[in-house]
Every structure is written in structure tokens, then in C-alpha cells.
Amino acid sequence: MSTQTILPVDRETVAALSSRKNEPAWLAEFRLQALEKAATLDYPKLEKTKIERWNLDSYGTHADAAEAKSFADVPAEARGFLNEDGAQDMDNVLVQHNSGVVYRRLNAELAAKGIIFTDLETAVREHEALVKPYLMQALKADEHRMAALHAALWNGGAFLYVPKNVEVDIPLQALFYTDNAQATFAPHVLIVAEANSRVSYMDNYVSGQLQAPIVHNGVVEVFVKPGAKVTYASIHHLGEQATDVTFRRAVVENDGRIEWIVGEMHNGNAASETNSILEGNGSTSDAKIICVGNGEQKLNITTKAVHVGKSSDSQMITRAVMRESASSIINGITKIEKGATKANGEQTERVLMLSPKARGDANPILLIDEDDVTAGHAASAGQVNQEQVFYMMSRGISREDAENLIIRGFLAPVVAEVPNEYLQQLLKSYIERKLGQ
């Protein structure tokens, strides 16, 4: 049973946050109620990981961000994560620096189609009718303590709305950047894609030189209406001082589709859940996730699909590389509810360990309450295949190069799916760095 707990923030701090942001009364009250719930809720229960032993108290305080008048005013280090020279002006981009969004720009052509792409704080005030029905609905504030604390403290974030029958040909992009461990960093991403719309969105979570521990408690909610398709690509590359906890949820209606492409490249402890709730008949999801661990890192990565609709289909691939003394728990969960006839769920989890001290655990889980369905899983955890290494060495390739080629090929199916060439190259550089190359 849960007991009353001392929280990292108090009621006065949360109330002051709402007041400073001039939030509507319903949101101010919602934040306070969430904080009260947090005091009595447990931390999320993760397979084979005691997250409560991690540093989960370093939230800091909200620090107002100075608005950037132009892209050149965005911190130089942050700009470098968006384009190669870090100077070129960019459309369809949003940048959060520590506790608030400092830059947002949507080109006139997309705005004329009714697309909204702005920070969530602004969206709450200017597009309340579009935000209120969805905020903290895919992930409820009373699910666990991390969800409740996020609901009480979220800041900045992104809101993307795509009207019915509108197709967006270019990906929209957000950067969430923290370099101050004393500033609360808890962005919330909310995407609503109306019927028969199409959109690609990608974001990058990065940190500068953090001088003290910090918690990133992030939530992503995606609502895919009938016949719509959303592609969501995300790379996390926070520093060793950061504890990264992220919950991603998509609710997919009839014939809708969600595609997840995720690179978990953290340097500190990290836990993430990427969950597709296939509510509609004919709804589909595809999740491709990679992670690389090194040092003393502890990672818990969960990919999940919940089938509610008939003839729904989920595909999940998770690949992890562990080196040095890193450890990972890789969970794949397919849940098929009663009544979800003709549903199909397939999942694969593979862990590659590069040192004797590295640890990896691949856990395929099938929870099936309906007879007329198909489901499958494959899982493996082990060292680099030495037969492959020897074969390449017999062709004149050194052992080190052979192992590197195998690792790159192992991760390639996800890297190749990132819908932006520069971000794809950035992900490759993160991988090379984490592998010590």
C-alpha cells in the first residue's frame, strides 16, 4: 500500500507556476490535484528494475526562458543539433531551453492549411478547446508517481495539430535542450492528427555540461484519428548527470497508424515506455527502437502494444548494445484484449553484449485474452557472433573493424528510418561516441 511521501516540490511552487504562466483555472487545479495524488502513488513498476533506487528527486525549480527573437538568438550549442552549421535559419522548428520554449517557427504554407505547431503552454491559452480533451488522457495522472509529478510540473513542450485530410510532406522538428541542472526540465509533447491526415514529427533531447544531477520526467501523447498516420522519431542523448524517464503513448482509431522510431542514447540511467493503444478496427503500429549502454548505466526499455480493435496489427523491433558494465532490461509486451478478433502482434528483442561485465535481458511477454488472433515473438541476448567475425577476418578485415561492422548492421534498421538526413547522421555520431569509436 502507498504511504504519504515527501515530494520534491510543494503546493505553493506548483500554484505559483500556474499563476506566472496565466494558465486557465482548470489547468491550475489539475496541476494541484496531480501533486496531491503524487504523494500517495507508487513509482511505476518496471520489469526487473527498482526505479525507486535511482535519483528521482532532482527536479530543480522552474526558470523562465528568454524568448529568442530569431534563430541566431538560440544558444549556439543547441543550434548545432538542428542543422550542420548551426546558423542557417529554419522553419517548422521548436526549441526548448531548460524550462521553457525559446523559439518556434511554422512556415506560412503549413499555417494556411490549419496546422498548429507551437509550445504547449501557448496552446493551452490560445487553443484550449483542442488541448483540454487530450492533455494527460493517454497517460493518466493517477497511474503512478512519475505521471502525477509530470502532470503537476510539465513545462514548455510541443503541441502539433493536423486538421482532417491534411498531409504534411516535410517533418516538423523539436529540440529539447537542458544545460542547467537547477532548472526543471519536463517537456510534454501532444500530437493530434485528425481523420485521414499525415504527418512526421521528430525530436531530439540533449544536454550541455550539467554540473549536478537532474531528472527529465517527460511524456508524449499522440492521438491518431481514423485513417490518419503519424510517424514519430525521437533521439535521447542526455548526459551522465541526467536520469531520463519517458512515457510515450499513442491512441490509434479505426485504420489509423502510428510509427515509432526511437534512439535511446543516454549516458545516465534511463527508463522508457513506448506504448501503442490500438483502439480502432484495422489500426496498426510499428515500433523500431535501439539503445546503447556504456559505463555503469542501467536501462529499462519497454515497447508495448495493446490491441482493442478487430484486425489490429502491431510490429515491434528493439535492439540494444551493451558495453563495459552497462546493464539493460528490454521488454516487449503484446496485449490482446477480449474481442480483438483477427488481431496480429509480432515482436523481436535482441541484446548484444560487448564485454564480459555487460548485462542484457530480453523479455518477450504475450498477454492474450482472445482466441481468434495471431501473435509471435523472438528474443536473444548474447555476445558478438564470432563466426561472423572470423569470416570477415578471413577476408582481410581486422577484428575491431569486423565487430564495428556487425554492430552497425545490428542497429541499421532503426537508424535508416529517421526521417531527416542530418538527424540521422547525428544519431550515427551518438552511436559511434557511445561505442568508444
Task: Give short role names for the model-derived ranges.
Residues 109-397, 411, 415-437:
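Conserved beta-strand/loop scaffold segments within soluble protein domains that form the structured core
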Residues 2-148, 317-323:
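N-terminal amphipathic, basic helical "cap/leader" segment at the start of enzyme domains
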